[in-house]
């Protein structure tokens, strides 16, 4: 044992002598020790920061495909306590209309309303006594295939264990967006497999501005309101909670205009879908009709045109990718969704397959025809005020000509302040073929069941 101790002492004294005699070697070993210490400290700090982040920080990520993405950006632009180093500009073009009829058109001003939203980078906001870091990231490689815009995400991080702060924030952002779109109607169109807003929200149209036969307008409006009030009635009886409407009649009778005004009356948006659109398949159609935005009606315009060649060439030969059976399954098949209102329009009801318009797929059929004496008088009064004799004279001229309501409105627009000129010009309107309600009860051969 004494020999071993003596050997260790000799070795230690030798190393000490070597280090004291070689300053470079001593400095190198010192630097190695210092570097190792820094590496251990760095690893400890990273582990500690990661632990603190897991235990004390809460984060939520909002991808650009989410509807709350734009809502949050525009809400954040209104936050007073905000620190942003980088901003992005978004503009909205609005046309300032003349204040009175005497103002000349060249005085109309195209205004652009600019809003500064947070740009890519890190920003900080204070919300309900909590500081939140907002990081907006934009990918240089990934793109949204439906819009062609770069893929973006927003990450919210706060030093709080209360996850409810994010729910409250996003709910407030959603309410902010809804208040900004109050008294507006958003038009959606199909982009790939999802609905995207088409342009900016439009001002609601008053239902009274669409002149239809009073019984038709009241019948449809009352039926829709009754449907929306009785969801529980459908549930308790096991009936699918959906409603289908068919508006048919000659061109210019007000089918689309009425739906736009009805959506405003209901405070609903409109999803427009063209069945003849290139690339629209059965699966995509089914997905779109099963994922309609909340509080929105679906409009299938000119539904007859998508399948007008089907009877002649079969399901393989017509120009659209949607099959007739695919449409029927999307409307009321096993995978079709509930809580849905669908409006179809057509100028040629005789071309529709009976399987498409049977109850369950089309529950209400309404004929919107050419101008009737009642409609002529009502529209005349709206434009020129009360003048029964002149309104009757106009009615005697246009009704035998089977004039459409669109043509009648165009006549009034051309003669804004001269009802007498409108009556004289009405004599030059062309004669149109008569149009009458179609009898769907007549037995016709069905191509599908």
UniProtKB/Swiss-Prot annotation:
It catalyses: ATP + H2O = ADP + phosphate + H(+). The keyword Protein biosynthesis does not apply. Residues 42-449 are mitochondrial matrix. PROSITE patterns: AAA. GO terms for biological process: mitochondrial respiratory chain complex III assembly; protein insertion into mitochondrial inner membrane from matrix. The chain crosses the membrane at residues 21-41. One of its GO terms (cellular component) is mitochondrial inner membrane. It comes from the Eukaryota. InterPro entries: AAA+_ATPase (IPR003593), ATPase_AAA_core (IPR003959), ATPase_AAA_CS (IPR003960), BCS1_N (IPR014851), Mitochondrial_chaperone_BCS1 (IPR050747), P-loop_NTPase (IPR027417). Residues 1-20 are mitochondrial intermembrane. Keywords: ATP-binding, Chaperone, Hydrolase, Membrane, Mitochondrion, Mitochondrion inner membrane, Nucleotide-binding, Transmembrane, Transmembrane helix. Gene3D superfamilies: P-loop containing nucleotide triphosphate hydrolases (3.40.50.300). It is found in: Mitochondrion inner membrane. It holds the Pfam family BCS1_N. SMART domains: AAA, BCS1_N. PANTHER family: BCS1 AAA-TYPE ATPASE (PTHR23070). Belongs to the AAA ATPase family. BCS1 subfamily. Chaperone necessary for the incorporation of Rieske iron-sulfur protein rip1 into the mitochondrial respiratory chain complex III. This is Probable mitochondrial chaperone bcs1. It comes from Schizosaccharomyces pombe (strain 972 / ATCC 24843) (Fission yeast). The lineage of its organism: Eukaryota, Fungi, Dikarya, Ascomycota, Taphrinomycotina.
């Amino acid at each position: 044992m004494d020999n071993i101790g003596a050997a260790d002492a000799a070795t230690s004294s030798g190393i000490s002598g070597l280090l004291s005699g070689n300053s470079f070697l001593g400095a190198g070993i010192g630097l190695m020790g210092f570097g190792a210490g820094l590496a251990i400290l760095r690893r400890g700090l990273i582990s500690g920061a990661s632990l603190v982040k897991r235990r004390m920080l809460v984060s939520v990520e909002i991808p650009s495909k989410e509807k709350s993405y734009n809502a949050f950006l525009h809400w954040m632009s209104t936050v007073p306590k905000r620190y942003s180093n980088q901003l992005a500009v978004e503009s909205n073009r609005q046309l300032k209309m003349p204040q009175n009829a005497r103002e000349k058109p060249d005085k109309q001003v195209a205004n652009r309303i600019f809003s500064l939203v947070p740009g890519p980078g890190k920003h900080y906001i204070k919300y309900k006594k909590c500081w939140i870091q907002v990081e907006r990231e934009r990918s240089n490689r990934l793109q949204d295939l439906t819009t062609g815009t770069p893929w973006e995400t927003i990450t919210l991080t706060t030093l709080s264990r209360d996850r409810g702060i994010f729910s409250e924030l996003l709910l407030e952002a959603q309410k902010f967006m809804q208040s900004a779109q109050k008294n507006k109607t958003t038009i959606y169109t199909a982009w790939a497999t999802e609905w995207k807003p088409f342009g900016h929200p439009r001002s609601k149209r008053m239902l009274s501005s669409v002149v239809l036969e009073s019984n038709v307008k009241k019948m449809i409006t009352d039926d829709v309101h009754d449907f929306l009030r009785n969801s529980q009635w459908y549930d308790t009886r096991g009936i699918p909670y959906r409603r289908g409407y068919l508006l048919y009649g000659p061109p210019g009778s007000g089918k689309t205009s009425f739906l736009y005004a009805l959506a405003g009356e209901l405070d609903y948006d409109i999803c427009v879908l063209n069945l003849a659109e290139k690339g629209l398949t059965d699966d995509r159609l089914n997905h779109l009709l099963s994922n309609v935005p909340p509080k929105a009606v679906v409009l299938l315009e000119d539904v007859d045109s998508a399948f007008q060649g089907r009877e002649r060439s079969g399901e393989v030969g017509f120009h659209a990718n949607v099959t007739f059976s695919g449409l029927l399954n999307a409307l009321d098949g096993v995978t079709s969704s509930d809580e849905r209102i669908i409006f179809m329009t057509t100028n040629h009801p005789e071309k529709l397959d009976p399987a498409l318009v049977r109850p369950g797929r089309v529950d209400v059929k309404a004929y919107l025809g050419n101008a009737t004496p009642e409609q002529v008088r009502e529209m005349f009064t709206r434009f020129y005020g009360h003048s029964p004799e002149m309104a009757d004279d106009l009615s005697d001229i246009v009704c035998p000509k089977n004039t459409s309501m669109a043509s009648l409105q165009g006549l009034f627009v051309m003669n804004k302040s001269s009802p007498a000129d409108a009556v004289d010009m009405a004599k030059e309107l062309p004669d149109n073929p008569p149009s009458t309600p179609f009898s769907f009860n007549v037995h016709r051969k069905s191509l599908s069941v």
